[in-house]
Amino acid sequence: MGAMAYSLLLCLLLAHLGLGEVGASLDPSERPDSSRERTSRGKQHGQQLPRASAPDPSIPWSRSTDGTILAQKLAEEVPMDVASYLYTGDFHQLKRANCSGRYELAGLPGKSPSLASSHPSLHGALDTLTHATNFLNMMLQSNKSREQTVQDDLQWYQALVRSLLEGEPSISRAAITFSTESLSTPAPQVFLQATREESRILLQDLSSSAHHLANATLETEWFHGLRRKWRPHLHRRGSNQGPRGLGHSWRRRDGLGGDRSHVKWSPPFLECENGSYKPGWLVTLSAAFYGLQPNLVPEFRGVMKVDINLQKVDIDQCSSDGWFSGTHKCHLNNSECMPIKGLGFVLGAYQCVCKAGFYHPRVFSVNNFQRRGPDHHFSGSTKDVSEEAHVCLPCREGCPFCADDRPCFVQEDKYLRLAIISFQALCMLLDFVSMLVVYHFRKAKSIRASGLILLETILFGSLLLYFPVVILYFEPSTFRCILLRWVRLLGFATVYGTVTLKLHRVLKVFLSRTAQRIPYMTGGRVMRMLAVIVLVVFWFLVGWTSSMCQNLERDILLVGQGQTSDNLTFNMCLIDRWDYMTAVAEFLFLLWGIYLCYAVRTVPSAFHEPRYMAVAVHNELIITAIFHTIRFVLASRLQPDWMLMLYFAHTHLTVTVTIGLLLIPKFSHSSNNPRDDIATEAYEDELDMGRSGSYLNSSINSAWSEHSLDPEDIRDELKKLYAQLEIYKRKKMITNNPHLQKKRCSKKGLGRSIMRRITEIPETVSRQCSKEDKEGTDHSAAKGTGLVRKNPTESSGNTGRPKEESLKNRVFSLKKSHSTYDHVRDQTDESSSLPTESQEEEVTENSTLESLSSKKLTQKVKEDSEAESTESVPLVCKSASAHNLSSEKKPGHPRTSMLQKSLSVIASAKEKTLGLAGKTQTLVMEDRAKSQKPQPKDRETNRKYSNSDNTETNPNSNHTEELRKPQKSGIMKQQRVNLPTANPDASSSTTQIKDNFDIGEVCPWEVYDLTPGPVPSEPKAQKHVSIAASEVEQNPASFSKEKSHHKPKAAEGLYQANHKSIDKTEVCPWESHGQSPLEDENRLISKTPVLPGRAREENGSQLYTTNMCAGQYEELPPKAVASKVENENLNQMGDQEKQTSSSVDIIPGSCISSNNSPQPLTSRAEVCPWEFEPLEQPNAERIVALPASSALSASKIPGPRK
């Protein structure tokens, strides 16, 4: 038997190889037929596939992908112990189960048998069965096999069955049945079986018990299933070719048993032995073999089957074919099914792996089924049998991977961020409102002192600096990261560029140590310099943005992720090297600002603005340094909420503080009394700084020469300036004066009050003068004739009835002289002043007028009071420079000049005070010795000619000056005073003798500046406008310094010749006149309107006064002749020219002295031609000169006028 078995195996091998050789040795003529046969069989097979793949409840691989159906069937149909064994693989569960027969897993979800055959662990057994079946087909279809009987070939069949178990270890049992007749007998005649028992193979001949195969049961389904499928209806075209041709035809089509598709698969089953299930799942593979009848018709001969142990075969529930395929319970939208190999024939051998962004709430077992121990009884409920629902939950937002519900991305505090963005929006709104408020109060002194355009620029830049907090509130993106750099750098350049340039302008203007005028940095020039700075920053940002866009093309992102100490990630704008460079640039720029703050630390300013700007710059430097340090060191570990709060704190500690430092003092200063800062404040408005000289030695008139300013503003300011100069002149005159007694009195407070209010003229003065005028109009003409002698040139000016009305209706806008650069306030500001202050001013001014006009006040009292009051207010002579504070109310000239501050008193107040005192003392002594006798005669002459001049000019002035608006205040000379039309020869004669007359005869006090003395030499100023002072007798010492820069040195000799003819009364006229003339003058002041005329010339630098004698004809620059010719042309314009002139002429002291001098009358006529006008003037015209006399009285006390 062993030899026969081995020979049978060798035959099987040769038969298998022979089939391949026969197929390869076919001739070409037969191959087309073979291809056609294969094509027809493929079509037949394709038509049969739908039926083969239809779900069949009797097989376990029916198509079903719902895992819930499997769980329900296992719970309802499968015995409890069998289901537990199927899930756990524990064979102890089967020992408790009783059985009467085999149990098959039929009707469960699965795939078709044709797809199940692809399992790799079953390929060996399937191939072995197929080869054995093909061998039997070949043997039975040969001619010789027909002649042999079954009994003769029994040994060969036994050897074939034995070889199947020896050739494939997975086969546990093999059997073969053989029938002599195909369908006549229901049971086979031969039934051979080989069983593997541990290490040996048991071969049995069960032919005697083969009759039980005739019954169709589950155990005999492998035989009856194949027998029922056989039908003898197959007819082939090669049936008439003989046995040889028929054999070739069968071999070409591989026979009926030569294909794996002909193998029948049984469902997995458990065998029942001795009333219990044997452990291990089995499957039966069976295939039929056929023979040929004598007429070459194939007939069914038998079935060969093998039982395969499935205990080592894995169930792949994740696969698309095979047993229980597609029965996993993983959710494919959030998880993925992964089979687990090596667990055997058990269910649940897979795991649901959550996809990216999902996690499972708990860690589950390897096969997703809790294996039960041997003592655990299967409950049979659906919950226990069914698999757990493997639902993967999504991770927190922003987490690509997670293991639990903990967030991997930083969770933002919504309420905190909402509060921050709300407050930031409020601050931005307030910043915008501040821009509107600043524009609304653009005419206020505090706003104009800093410059409206510059303040608006700072507020706009602050609005840009508020935007980084708004950008960081949103999720970082490439656009937002780029925009963050833009708003930060542009805002920084705008705000702190403007602040630094303002400090630079203060440094250039206030700390210039030269008397020469320097190019002044106006607001427009500062804006141009700021535009250069912003343009540089803009160009850098454009280049940086271009490089960032190029990096994006190279996959270099601008937005990255940071990680906190808690391993929480967050998105952030990455920091590159350019950020370090911009931080260094900001630091260096702020260092320059700190240097400027240190340089201008001693410069006095209005509202202390440089001081506040210095605090803002230092604060920005310190806070920004801390901010950049934290940002660069902790940026990758600082979560977005902290970064937002860092930007928020940095913004408000710098930007908000800067805005507060610049705006709060401006709006809060109006409520404080600025009297303490009278001598130290200096406005730095671009108009003020550009329209004032650098020092007092620069001509004050040159401050207005190149600006299209309002002449009224100029006159208002100059009137106050001349009043201050008068105070200093009187102080120097009484200093060390041997003619005055040294006597201390108790009226020092009166002097202080005079000095404090010396530049203030309240409305009460006008009302008081108007009341006195009504009472003393009857004798005003007689008093006026005595006064005209002192001021004959006043009659030639435009002084008349309009001055009287203007003085009554005028509201003096400046109540007090704040400092060097005081501003002229509007009528609205005046009306809102406190009543207590006006009452105090009224009392003070009444006391001032009484002190100046009273006969009982001795000269000694004047000396003491004025000396004490002057010393109580330091540096009061400093130029106010507020002439352009009202320039925004009126359109300015298109061309702006560049002028400087007059701060000479700040530099050398003590030195000049001593120098002026010495000169004034000498002047007073000489004038008093030379001018006592000829004084009455000179006064009579002056009275006559001043009356005639006033008669001619009064009607025109009355008509034209009433048309002026009465809002402006101040009694100032016009910038161009026309000669009287009644005396045209005077103009021509003045032009002809310009080079011949002696300066000493006209203005003797001006020669003091040309003589060597203790007065420090001061450089000459440039082209200027000579504006006449109110009274030459009262301010020769102060005016001499201004005019000394323009006097020719040849005037020294002529001055010495006529110097002795000056009388004391000409220098100090108030000492010789009584109280009555002063009272008359005070009564007439209210009748004299003081509307300042407008010199409407296009070029303000060409406006010169034509007064030659003691203020009426002041000294002219080298272009004096051309200016005089222009005056003659303007005289022909008649009333229009007279309308533009308003003057408070002074008493020509030089002319009086010339009348008393021994010089011929003709020389005096050349100097003062108006004194020799025809005397045929009507007597009624003498009364017209009284307003001029009253104006003289008003000019004697110029202090309270402002």
From Swiss-Prot:
Record text about domains: The Cache-like region shares similarity with the Cache domain, a well-known receptor for amino acids. It acts as a ligand-binding module that recognizes and binds glycine and taurine.
Gene responsible for this protein: Gpr158
A Gene Ontology cellular-component term: plasma membrane
Purpose: Metabotropic receptor for glycine that controls synapse formation and function in the brain. Acts as an atypical G-protein coupled receptor that recruits and regulates the RGS7-GNB5 complex instead of activating G proteins. In absence of glycine ligand, promotes the GTPase activator activity of RGS7, increasing the GTPase activity of G protein alpha subunits, thereby driving them into their inactive GDP-bound form.
Cross-link Glycyl lysine isopeptide (Lys-Gly) (interchain with G-Cter in ubiquitin), where in sequence: 774
Topology of the protein relative to the lipid bilayer: Multi-pass membrane protein
Cytoplasmic side: 440-451, 502-525, 598-611, 665-1202
Record flagged with keyword Lipid biosynthesis: no
Biased composition (Basic and acidic residues): 28-40, 769-781, 819-828, 925-943
Main location: membrane
Binding site for glycine: 172-173, 271, 307
Entry protein name: Metabotropic glycine receptor
Listed GO MF terms: enzyme activator activity; G protein-coupled glycine receptor activity; transmembrane signaling receptor activity
Cache-like region: annotated span: 85-281
